[in-house]
């Protein structure tokens, strides 16, 4: 079995947003929203669904800054005033288990090697299957219907990392 680790976005990239006005956010093409559906606003720094009434930023994020044709950015939700949550090795955050997901596998050069769409409850099996391919260096999880990036999944060589 290959060990893996879910990697959330670093909240420090977004902390400055907490101090901006609606006008300043708008000038940066960022929208401050109030969560009105649960689940429905998956946060990329906590890898949890934001709670009803909570505020989230909707931003365009450069989630695959590679020198390949697969360079990509897209919309993501960031919970206001939250810190990055770290997950232990081989732990899958529960927000992934109830979504239709797209798993994209990349090599060390940022080239896509494999991809699949499936229900989240089989995510662990898909991660293990993909990481059995030695050419695959890392994975990206996206929400399949809207196509939005969720997080990076790294292959971990040593269970103590």
Predicted segments, located by residue:
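Short, hydrophobic/π-rich interface segment
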Residues: 102-138, 142, 155-157
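Short terminal or interdomain "cap/linker" segment that borders an active site or interface and mediates
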Residues: 145-161
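Extended boundary segments
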Residues: 1-19
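Short, well-ordered loop/turn elements at secondary-structure boundaries
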Residues: 51-52, 72, 134-136, 144-145
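Short, flexible beta-strand-to-coil junctions
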Residues: 60-63, 142-146
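Generic beta-strand structural signal
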Residues: 74, 99-101, 137-139, 147-149
């Amino acid at each position: 079995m290959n060990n893996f680790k879910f990697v959330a976005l670093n909240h420090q990239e977004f902390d400055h947003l907490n101090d901006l006005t609606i006008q300043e956010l708008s000038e940066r093409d960022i929208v401050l929203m109030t969560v009105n559906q649960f689940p429905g606003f998956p946060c990329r720094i906590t890898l949890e669904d934001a709670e009803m009434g909570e505020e989230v930023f909707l931003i365009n994020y450069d989630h695959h800054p590679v020198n390949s044709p697969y360079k990509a950015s897209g919309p993501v939700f960031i919970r206001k005033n939250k810190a990055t949550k770290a997950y232990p090795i081989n732990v899958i955050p529960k927000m992934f288990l109830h979504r239709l997901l797209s798993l994209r596998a990349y090599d060390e050069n940022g080239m896509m090697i494999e991809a699949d769409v499936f229900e989240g409850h089989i995510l662990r099996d898909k991660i293990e299957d993909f990481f059995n391919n030695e050419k695959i260096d890392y994975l990206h999880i996206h929400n399949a219907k809207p196509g939005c990036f969720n997080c990076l999944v790294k292959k971990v060589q040593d269970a103590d990392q």
